[in-house]
UniProtKB/Swiss-Prot annotation:
FAD binds at G20, A21, G22, F23, X24, G25. Transmembrane segments: none annotated. Catalyzes the NADPH- and oxygen-dependent oxidation of the monocyclic monoterpene ketones 1-hydroxy-2-oxolimonene, dihydrocarvone and menthone. Is able to convert all enantiomers of these natural substrates with almost equal efficiency. Is thus involved in the conversion of the monocyclic monoterpene ketone intermediates formed in the degradation pathways of all stereoisomers of three different monocyclic monoterpenes, i.e. limonene, (dihydro)carveol and menthol, which likely make R.erythropolis able to grow on these compounds as the sole source of carbon and energy. The keyword Flavoprotein applies. This is Monocyclic monoterpene ketone monooxygenase. Its EC number is 1.14.13.105. Pathway: Terpene metabolism; monoterpene degradation. Optimum pH is 9.5. It catalyses: 1-hydroxylimonen-2-one + NADPH + O2 = 3-isopropenyl-6-oxoheptanoate + NADP(+) + H2O; (1R,4S)-1-hydroxylimonen-2-one + NADPH + O2 + H(+) = (4S,7S)-7-hydroxy-4-isopropenyl-7-methyloxepan-2-one + NADP(+) + H2O; (1S,4R)-1-hydroxylimonen-2-one + NADPH + O2 + H(+) = (4R,7R)-7-hydroxy-4-isopropenyl-7-methyloxepan-2-one + NADP(+) + H2O; (1R,4R)-dihydrocarvone + NADPH + O2 + H(+) = (4R,7R)-4-isopropenyl-7-methyloxepan-2-one + NADP(+) + H2O. It comes from Rhodococcus erythropolis.
């Protein structure tokens, strides 16, 4: 884990939440 959160990582996490159980969401969570 990085000490400084990246903007892309935050956006991916937010997208995962929107996505929910969607494939994109799972991909973002795995990534």
């Amino acid at each position: 884990m990085q000490t400084i959160p990246s903007t892309t990582e935050t956006a991916a996490d937010f997208d995962a939440v929107i996505x929910g159980a969607g494939f994109x969401g799972l991909y973002a969570l795995h990534r």
